[in-house]
Amino acid sequence: MDVYGLIGNPVEHSVSPPMHEAAYEALGLDARYVTFEPASEQLDTALEGASALGVRGLNVTIPFKEDVLDVVEPDPLAERIGAVNTIDFEGEPTGHNTDAAGVIRAFQHHDVERSGTAVVVGAGGAGRAAAFALADEGMEVHIANRTVSRATALATEVPDATGHGLDELAELVPDADVLVNATSVGMEADETPVPKRHLHEGLAVLDAVYAPLETRLLREADAAGATTIDGAWMLLFQGVEAFEIWTGKAAPVEPMNEALRSSL
């Protein structure tokens, strides 16, 4: 039996186990997905133990996404983003960041072209992944953040990117082709990071928030004629990418999606 899993603290509310277990069942794989919850100071020991026990791969969640960079060799994209969310133990353990693929594959699934101008709201982990992913697709990326210095600092790392404060969204969003909310704003029903007057037809909006699935931003974007993509799609496709890295097989997207959404 092949063993995969999730390492983080806490992990009890993660939806990754049912999503990956659904993939194994759909493909008839003899595999299990388990969770590991070490204390912060035990990360090195936990990863060494997982490798010694023959664990094939791990997803990584808070608070370890950055700490893992000191333990396993990251691939070039994970190194640029500055975070690892997937470890492949085949051969020399390698760290990957599949959040970037989660963004791109979510847009691909909804037939959204990644060309023109993108606005990314948020300069944290999800914002970094989205900014690098869209820049690598050839898009001009504008990063807006409550703390402007974080946006401008990230923009110096991302090709063809600029950093802005949230007050500049009024100028940025009306001309954008793609908008990504990479903040937690929207978890409260009446909050949105972008006023509805800036949303427009022809815009594609991805909201990384997945609880609730239908955020105020997505409702107002839909009313404005924009293409809307909820956060579960990004969550799904980062998991799909991890599955494919570990197994070398095409992931069964629909069973994984059904299991994920049933768990939210």
Curated annotation (Swiss-Prot):
Covalent S-S links between cysteines: none
Cited function: Involved in the biosynthesis of the chorismate, which leads to the biosynthesis of aromatic amino acids. Catalyzes the reversible NADPH linked reduction of 3-dehydroshikimate (DHSA) to yield shikimate (SA).
SUPFAM superfamilies per the UniProt record, alphabetical: Aminoacid dehydrogenase-like, N-terminal domain, NAD(P)-binding Rossmann-fold domains
Protein's name in the database: Shikimate dehydrogenase (NADP(+))
EC numbers on record: 1.1.1.25
Gene source species: Natronomonas pharaonis (strain ATCC 35678 / DSM 2160 / CIP 103997 / JCM 8858 / NBRC 14720 / NCIMB 2260 / Gabara)
NCBIfam families attached to this UniProt entry: aroE, PRK00258.3-3
Family in the record: Belongs to the shikimate dehydrogenase family.
Entry's Gene Ontology molecular function annotations: NADP binding; shikimate 3-dehydrogenase (NADP+) activity
Record keywords: Amino-acid biosynthesis, Aromatic amino acid biosynthesis, NADP, Oxidoreductase
Binding positions for shikimate per the UniProt entry: S14, V15, S16, T61, N85, D99, Y210
Residues annotated as the enzyme's active site: K65
Highest taxon of source: Archaea
Subunit structure, as described in the record: Homodimer.
One BP annotation, GO: aromatic amino acid family biosynthetic process
Lineage of producing organism: Archaea, Methanobacteriati, Methanobacteriota, Stenosarchaea group, Halobacteria
Pathway membership: Metabolic intermediate biosynthesis; chorismate biosynthesis; chorismate from D-erythrose 4-phosphate and phosphoenolpyruvate: step 4/7
Pfam families: SDH_C, Shikimate_DH, Shikimate_dh_N
Catalytic function, reaction form: shikimate + NADP(+) = 3-dehydroshikimate + NADPH + H(+)
Chain sites annotated for binding NADP(+): G122, A123, G124, G125, A126, N145, R146, T147, V148, S149, R150, A208, G231
